[in-house]
Design a protein with these regions (language model features):
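Caspase-like cysteine protease fold
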Residues: 111-152
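N-terminal, post-signal-peptide segments of secreted/periplasmic proteins
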Residues: 153-169
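Stable alpha-helical elements in mature extracytoplasmic
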Residues: 11-15, 54-57, 93-97, 144, ...
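Functional beta-strand-loop-alpha-helix junction segments that form "active/interaction loops"
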Residues: 1-25
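Catalytic cores of nucleophile-dependent amide-cleaving enzymes
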Residues: 26-120
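Low-complexity, Pro/Thr/Ser/Gly/Ala-rich linker/spacer regions in secreted
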Residues: 68-70, 149-156
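Short, basic, glycine/proline-bearing loop/turn elements
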Residues: 1-5, 85, 153-155
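A generic secondary-structure signal
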Residues: 17-21, 60, 64, 167
Length: 169
């Protein structure tokens, strides 16, 4: 299922609302522009400086419904979040951001420490930094990755068109 965030609304809140309506989510793939220790989610830039202010939302992303939380229900594997965005895990601050996001969501996280996207622009599709074991494959086929002609770079730049990549999922 593909969910496109409204660019005029808080993206962290939108993701929380979306995940609250679903159960047994194994993985969430987030396609966004990024920078070191920062990710654009809808109309919100989530970063190391403001992540604590979103704690209440982030902690609900994979929370069990009350009935399941009070039963013998258990999840055998941690959920996973794959962050497709340039340089999100670059620098010590970037790694700290990814680790804190993992702690708050309870998910294993995979993120990139370099450009994500077209090899012709110096990018790749490897998510080099992880906070745990990531078993989920990339969301995009090899053909879609090769066809994408941009990178998911700095939040202040427009580099690449998401439409071709989103349509390829």
């Amino acid at each position: 299922e593909i969910v496109i965030l409204n660019a005029d609304r808080d993206g962290i809140e939108q993701i929380a609302e979306t995940l609250k309506q679903r159960q047994n989510i194994a993985a969430v793939h987030i396609l966004s522009h990024g920078a070191a220790a920062s990710l654009q989610l809808g109309g919100t830039e989530l970063n190391l400086s403001n992540i604590e202010s979103y704690r209440n939302y982030l902690e609900t992303w994979f929370a069990l419904p009350a009935a399941e939380a009070n039963s013998n229900y258990s999840i055998t594997a941690k959920p996973e979040i794959l962050l497709y965005g340039c340089n999100v895990a670059a620098t010590e601050a970037g790694v700290a951001f990814v680790e804190r996001l993992s702690q708050l969501t309870g998910a294993n996280i995979a993120a990139s420490d370099n450009l994500t996207g077209s090899a012709a622009l110096g990018g790749d599709w490897e998510l080099e930094v992880t906070t745990g074991n990531i078993e989920t494959p990339l969301a995009f086929s090899a053909e879609a990755r090769e066809a994408y002609n941009g990178v998911l770079a700095d939040l202040n730049q427009t580099t690449g068109d998401f439409n071709g990549l989103v349509n390829a999922i």
